[in-house]
Amino acid sequence: DGVTIQDSLYAIAHLSDIHANVKVGISFVSMEKAQQNVCPETFDGQLSNLRKAWNEKLSKIEITGTDKQKRMFYTGIYHTMLMPVDKSGENPHFSATPYYDDYYAIWDTYRTSMPLLTLIDEDRQRDMVNSLLNIYEHDGYMPDARSGNWNGRTQGGSNAEIVIADAFAKGMEGINYELALQAMIKDAEVPPMDVDSDSLLDSALRESLAAERHGRGGLKEYNS
């Protein structure tokens, strides 16, 4: 049974010994984009493609050791590549550029997985750096944590700068480092004040809330 309510669809299926394959497309942009995101492959075909893709990623590092040690090592490498998530084309505000979401969170990954990805998956890391700069251009600040197209509530810090510095030190090309420097200087010098200025909150509280969102608290005191 299927029912459509206000552009939403749900279905109730009663199955016994029948094997059912369901294809689902999801999009943050539109229903049309969701339809495009429905995978045309069969389950077995997609499984084969995924195995091939992951083998290509994981085979960039070869180690020796026991089967247990290898399993632990490659499981760790696999986990480093799960987040941030490539959602290019799925941000309704700037869908034409590389876009990564679910940075959780850069104050941990700038010193662990991101320097590793710079070495073993340069294209992905380049896209992530460019995504940080795209977020700066559209939202005003680079995030320290981000999910659901929104900079998350964070502890203080500007760790995206360290990610960019690592890319620059390793000679990564394809990044607008002049724009990156502009973003870094703003992070270091300009306290965020993007909470609605017409709200009933006083300016100090609005500044505190904005700083919490962007992880930019205490800049005035730090720079004084």
Task: List each model region and its residues.
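Acidic/polar, glycine-enriched structural segments that form the non-catalytic walls/loops
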Residues: 1-102, 134, 173-189
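Aromatic-rich carbohydrate-recognition surfaces in CAZymes
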Residues: 105-109, 113-224
